[in-house]
UniProtKB/Swiss-Prot annotation:
Annotated ranges, domain BRCT: 578-661
Naturally occurring in which organism (per UniProt): Alkaliphilus oremlandii (strain OhILAs)
Catalyzed chemical reaction(s): NAD(+) + (deoxyribonucleotide)n-3'-hydroxyl + 5'-phospho-(deoxyribonucleotide)m = (deoxyribonucleotide)n+m + AMP + beta-nicotinamide D-nucleotide
Family to which this protein belongs: Belongs to the NAD-dependent DNA ligase family. LigA subfamily.
SMART domains noted in UniProt: BRCT, HhH1, LIGANc
Gene: ligA
SUPFAM superfamilies per the UniProt record, alphabetical: BRCT domain (SSF52113), DNA ligase/mRNA capping enzyme, catalytic domain (SSF56091), Nucleic acid-binding proteins (SSF50249), RuvA domain 2-like (SSF47781)
EC number(s) on file: 6.5.1.2
Job of this protein: DNA ligase that catalyzes the formation of phosphodiester linkages between 5'-phosphoryl and 3'-hydroxyl groups in double-stranded DNA using NAD as a coenzyme and as the energy source for the reaction. It is essential for DNA replication and repair of damaged DNA.
Cited Pfam families: BRCT, DNA_ligase_aden, DNA_ligase_OB, HHH_2, HHH_5, Nlig-Ia
Name assigned to this protein: DNA ligase
Length: 661
């Protein structure tokens, strides 16, 4: 795999993991695995001197859900840089001292717990709690005022009358969770998800039943008061009756910080709430101002992450699961065990080689490592328990369709792409998805019904479904049947890039499909593409190019694609005739909420005008289109313009944008 291709792959993987963690509250990988991929990305960006516009290294978190009204923070809620070793803390301290050299500002550190709950941003005006919001993407969160009002430790009124934003963490105590689960019809699995789920529930009564608590630790925006140090902020919070942790310590050297970290382990284990580390902050505000920020982190703070917790349990079984590409992945079934307030019963084993390397057997005891509130990993087996344990059988046949499997490198695949249910159902769902053929109303449940009841075995079979077939299916009334048939019919007239993406070519994502369409301009040309030309395209390396060629040379795929074309699929590339306009060839960034356009709509419109739409502001940006509640991008644009650096950057409103069209 080429370096640029790996860069693109890492960005896509990390963004998906971030979406699962921050938006859905359903983390799918361990913090350790995420950190390893993130660190690899950072090194690769330095090596290539390239940062992609959607790289997680310049982002602050995830997207906002649509269930709640968006709220724009008065001040950004930053992510924190992190480290795991004393050596890394010392390196950070050296950077801080180098940047502050000659400033005369004293260097002191304050250390606090890093709470493992849901971040809250509380807005007070004239002494009243007027808004509470989740962190969201750092500049825009979700308004959850009514839910937060149910947390009895958060004051509804405070003595201070100026406008302020107080940052904190919503938590569910371990003892509260245990008491709740004794009477709950559906026990909650862990405190973090319990708190997050309660605060993001549309019914505040549900939130109230969880009996949440909170700790506040910062004032991000303030009027009518000023602070010289972080300790003054904490004193202000206490004076205004905010819940503040009783653990806050000030240190004069980083070595004092490290000594404290080395002795705090037992104290942390006795807490009634989860914490996944410590936060070390520069105490003096003037020092923070001088240190400033990177694109993602404040230079004046560092999160020290605790070592992952490890325990042992019995491996009860291994279930092999089949994905869209036919790859078989082993899932470990464990004797349920509580690790840090989380009941762990499943873990993912990567592949057959992983099973062999870790020497695990069914019935043996295995080491489980859990880093924070994430899916755990099996580290290995306890050798003394292997005797009498049962070997895990290497699958010779697909667990779903019983076809003989094949091995490709470290992975095992089911080659029966035509009638293996998990593969076909996943492939049909992908084909019908919004970014692909956009068949409205199509779901995984629908795909399973069509597979089971109508014997759907090929993508082209979708276009041969009759009304009489659908109306017989459970949960299919007249309206639903007609709507689905209409959506399937409408999908025949599709964009070339959407069709290419819908086919599910291995290693070809949405962007690569778009690049292929723009370059070749016809489906036939893509089918006949040659290796040497393919690798000249953006982000297409040897592996992606070979994947495309292999895909279209497969005889079964040829038959399937020909059937789709014969069914009336007309994938067209529309060359946009770009008339001379002010945005042609310009770089544009969009921020905030627009009144007349969604984010996808405005991006498509700008691209039709010949503009390049990017996600970050720099001196090379030509236009920043700023909607309502624009956040950090607007601030950065204003800073660039005010700095006097040579730039053509111009900030425009939605009304100005429309006047320029």
């Amino acid at each position: 795999m080429g370096s640029m291709e790996r860069l693109r792959q890492l960005v896509d993987i990390l963004n998906e993991y971030s979406y699962q963690y921050y938006v859905l509250d359903e983390p799918v990988v361990s913090d350790k695995e995420y950190d390893q991929l993130y660190d690899e990305l950072v090194l690769l960006e330095k090596e290539l001197n390239t940062v992609l516009e959607d790289s997680p290294t310049i982002r602050v978190g995830g997207d906002v859900l649509k269930n709640f009204k968006a709220h724009n923070h008065l001040a950004p809620l930053w992510s924190l840089d992190k480290c795991k070793t004393p050596e890394e803390l010392i390196s950070w301290d050296l950077r801080v001292r180098r940047l502050l050299e000659g400033s005369g500002v004293p260097i002191e550190y304050v250390m606090e717990y890093k709470f493992d709950g849901l971040t809250l941003n509380l807005t007070y005006n004239n002494g009243q709690l007027v808004q509470a919001a989740t962190r969201g993407n750092g500049t825009t969160g979700e308004g959850i005022l009514e839910q937060v009002k149910t947390i009895k430790t958060i004051p509804l009124t405070i003595p201070h009358k100026g406008r302020i934003e107080v940052q904190g963490e919503g938590l569910m105590g371990l003892s509260v969770l245990a008491a709740y689960n004794k009477t709950a019809l559906e026990p909650l699995k862990n405190p973090r998800n319990a708190a997050a789920g309660a605060l993001r529930n549309l019914d505040p009564k549900v939130t109230a039943k969880r009996k949440l608590s909170a700790f506040c630790y910062n004032v991000g925006f303030y009027e009518g008061i000023d602070f010289n140090t972080h300790m003054e902020i904490l004193a202000f919070l206490k004076a205004n009756k905010f819940p503040v942790s009783n653990y806050t310590k000030k240190f004069h050297t980083i070595h004092q910080v490290i000594e404290e970290i080395e002795t705090i382990g037992e104290q942390v284990k006795s807490l009634d709430f989860l914490t996944d580390g410590l936060v070390i902050k520069v105490n003096h505000m003037e020092a923070r101002r001088l240190l400033g920020y990177t694109q993602k982190f404040p230079r004046w703070a560092m999160a020290f992450k605790f070592e992952a917790e490890e325990m042992t349990t019995e491996l009860k079984d291994v279930i092999w699961q089949v994905g869209r590409t036919g790859k078989l992945t082993p899932a470990a079934v464990l004797e349920p065990i509580d690790i840090g307030g989380v009941t762990v019963s499943r873990a993912t084993l990567n592949n057959w080689e992983d099973i062999q390397r870790k020497k695990v057997k069914i019935g043996c005891r295995v080491w489980i490592r859990r880093s924070n509130d994430v899916i755990p990993e099996i580290m290995g087996s306890i050798e003394e328990t292997l005797e009498g344990a049962m070997d895990i059988e290497k699958p010779q046949h697909c667990p779903a369709c019983h076809s003989e499997v094949v091995e490709r490198g470290a992975h095992i695949f089911c080659p029966n792409s035509l009638s293996c249910k998990p593969q076909l159902v996943s492939r049909i769902v992908h084909y019908a998805s919004r970014d692909a053929m956009d068949i409205v109303g199509f779901s995984e449940k629908t795909a399973e019904q069509l597979f089971e009841e109508l014997n759907l075995r090929d993508l082209a079979d979708l276009y041969e479904i009759k009304y009489e077939d659908l109306i017989k299916l459970p949960r299919f009334g007249d309206k639903k049947a007609r709507n689905l048939l209409e959506a399937i019919e409408n999908s025949k007239n599709c964009k070339l890039d959407s069709f290419v993406y819908a086919l599910g070519i291995p290693n070809v994502g949405r962007k690569t499909a778009t690049d292929l369409a723009k370059h070749y301009k016809s489906f036939q040309a893509i089918q006949e593409a040659e290796f040497q030309e393919l690798i000249t395209l953006p982000d297409v390396g040897d592996i992606v190019a070979q994947s495309i060629i292999d895909f279209f040379e497969d005889e079964e795929i040829k038959k399937s694609v020909n059937r789709l074309i014969n069914e009336g699929i007309r994938p067209l590339f529309k060359e946009v005739e770009q008339q001379e306009n002010i945005f042609l060839g310009k770089t544009v960034v969009v921020t905030g909420t627009l009144e007349k356009y969604g984010r996808k709509e405005i991006k498509e419109l700008l691209e039709k005008l010949g503009a390049k739409v990017t996600g970050s502001v720099s001196k090379n940006t030509d236009f920043l289109l700023a909607g309502e509640a624009a956040g950090s991008k607007l601030e950065k644009a204003m800073e660039i313009i005010a700095s006097g650096v040579e730039t053509s950057l111009r900030i425009i409103s939605e009304a100005e944008f429309e006047a320029m069209l």
